[in-house]
């Protein structure tokens, strides 16, 4: 049994799950009309699961989003087109659609080139190109670029110890992504270790007087792909910052061991005035508890290097498909199921904050929130921040997901996933699909995050887990409690 299997198996209540699963297996084969609000009986849960597993609606919407629009960085024409496309698709389903205004940052990538122009042993007249990509929020070099010596660092302690050497130089944080952790079901933790340098590391380098800062790309595969992402730079100290392909970071480390290493770097991004955008909100109204809300969500924006199929096209289209699945079955939930396509997750989560600000008085009416933002790998169940004493209430849901091998439920005190962090701080229990993300960071934030990387059968499984979970939450009789507020600043990826 591998680590992921052990992690999932200990969460299952075998006796209750198997008993309920047997009921499902004998009852869900029959089709036919269903009551408008059938509740959480095994037949209804099985019908939702099976309907989702047989539909390619989300996959078709993903193709529309990625192939017809392309990149969707907040503030860009692509992001605006995506808002219109998603809103239109949800209106066609009969959902009640609202566009919630959000002021978003408008960062534009410019020229990005780099070469190693001087190093020990360099043949006269030669230089070596470095593959890199500017980080979100990066400052710019002069138009003609800057030339400076590179100092290679391997952790923040080394930055502190060598602070006197940093001023006026180009800092490179050469910290490899731990693919072994990713292969053993800990890709998120591996990413967290690396992203520390893209965030805090860039800010500390700027404070130390660096002329520019580079980070080794936070991701696996190492196919000379730079992985972009948000920097930790702040106004008043926005030095040029970029992610370097892993192979180039290793090359620079080797050359720096031979002697002084000089780079010619040109980055010309711009930070334009904030612009208007929107969260897309689509409601499937409830019945007797219509004033209570269950959110199902993904983020609509993407980075500008690719079409954001995995990050987060699959998340937003699987959320949209929850309403499509229930509409197809003519099921109406007791509580309102609200699909939210968040805007601006990648550079600041302003869409999520706008939603929290607008709904402070209604926080208690938000029963639960689901976000799918960890790629399109095979899903095995759910992670959740519900109180420990509420976990037993989910045995019927786990039983419904057991036939498709997605009954694993993993509880954590703080889920803190991106767009849901503000709701979680308000006490709203959060859920996120438990996904095999061992290869997710091969493509994450790169030019290779494209539609062809998504398997339709895996996306169908995402929809099945999300739709069944959303329905279950929307029809529960028992309260599931509130989540204790996480520490300030706690958030996911």
Q: What is the predicted role of each segment?
A:
Residues 37-44, 63, 67-183:
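Noncatalytic luminal/extracellular "stalk/propeptide" segments of secretory-pathway proteins
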Residues 53, 91, 121, 143, ...:
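Metal-dependent peptidase/peptidase-like ectodomains
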Residues 15-29:
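Bacterial N-terminal signal peptides
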Residues 45-53, 67-77, 148-156, 161, ...:
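Second-shell loop/turn segments in exported
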Residues 206, 212, 216-217, 234, ...:
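Active-site-adjacent substrate-binding region
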Residues 39-76, 102, 225-233, 301, ...:
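N-terminal capping segment at the start of a domain
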Residues 90, 197-198, 205, 280, ...:
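Alpha-helical metal-binding/catalytic segments enriched in His/Glu/Asp
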Residues 43-44, 119, 129-164, 231-309, ...:
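Soluble metallo-hydrolase cores and metallopeptidase-like ectodomains found primarily
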